[in-house]
Curated annotation (Swiss-Prot):
Subunit structure: Homodimer.
Top-level class of the enzyme under EC nomenclature: transferase
Molecular function (Gene Ontology), one example: tRNA (guanine(37)-N1)-methyltransferase activity
Main location: cytoplasm
Name this polypeptide is given: tRNA (guanine-N(1)-)-methyltransferase
């Protein structure tokens, strides 16, 4: 998997991906991360990459020429997606991460200011993606979210079992985790986790996962692959808490 990030701040991308899992994945050749400086491609003598918006209004807009030229300089013959990170985009989900992880190459455009000239989107962008309903100082931080979440799904980057058990893998949030010591500031590890009974532990974790999801992200429940036992458990819980499903 190759990530090609078009950015005004390549050091943000390169420094943040030089640690932990992403660093090891690059060393093993499982992923490759390139940061292309958009400013290197501007034809403006002052190296500007932004200008005032037509029609007036607050803020500046990134100009089309350096972005498109930067893209054309690194564009390969391989099929690839070109992702623009924007609040106006489709909401990013684990399913989209899985879809992107199947690609050989992804080009990610990081915007700044009020965004990029619409003609960039019209000419080269295949996907407009938003990581949430909030505003960031630049697209680099959103790009790092994509790189990390997609890389984890690339075969060999992390253990397959870890991927399968993580939150959202079944449209459910993950169960609580505990480690030593047994008691900390009066709070003890649930006894079932010390029982050695793997079937009981599995059941407890499943129920905890269901509870976390219904409390924090009830919108995920409808998309989850629920068993008859799961449904019965949720009905009992919701009735006891007077929650309407």
């Amino acid at each position: 998997m190759v990530f090609k990030v078009l950015t005004l701040f390549p050091e943000v991308i390169l420094q943040a991906t030089n640690f932990s899992i992403l660093k090891r994945a690059q060393e093993k050749g499982l992923i490759k991360i390139e940061a292309i400086n958009i400013r290197d491609y501007t034809k403006d003598k002052h190296k500007r990459t932004d200008d005032y918006p037509y029609g007036g209004g607050f803020g500046m807009v990134m100009t089309a020429q350096p972005i498109v030229d930067a893209y054309e300089s690194i564009k390969s013959s391989k099929p690839h997606r070109v992702i623009y990170l924007t609040p106006q985009g489709k909401k990013y989900t684990q399913d989209i991460a899985k879809e992107f992880s199947k690609e050989e190459e992804l080009v990610i455009i990081c915007g700044h200011y009020e965004g990029i000239d619409q003609r960039v989107i019209d000419l080269i962008v295949t996907d407009e993606i938003s990581i949430g309903d909030y505003v960031l100082s630049g697209g680099e931080y959103a790009a790092l979210v994509l790189i990390d979440s997609i890389s984890r799904l690339v075969e060999g980057v992390i253990e397959k079992k870890s991927v399968e058990e993580e939150s959202f893998s079944e449209c459910l949030l993950e169960y609580p985790h505990y480690t030593r010591p047994y008691e900390f500031r009066g709070l003890k590890v649930p006894e079932v986790l010390l029982s050695g009974n793997h079937e009981k532990i599995k059941k407890w974790r499943r129920y905890q996962s269901l509870l976390k999801t219904i409390k924090s992200r009830p919108d995920l429940i409808n998309a989850a692959n629920l068993t008859k036992e799961d449904i019965e458990f949720l009905i009992k819980y919701c009735e006891s808490q007077k929650i309407v499903l």
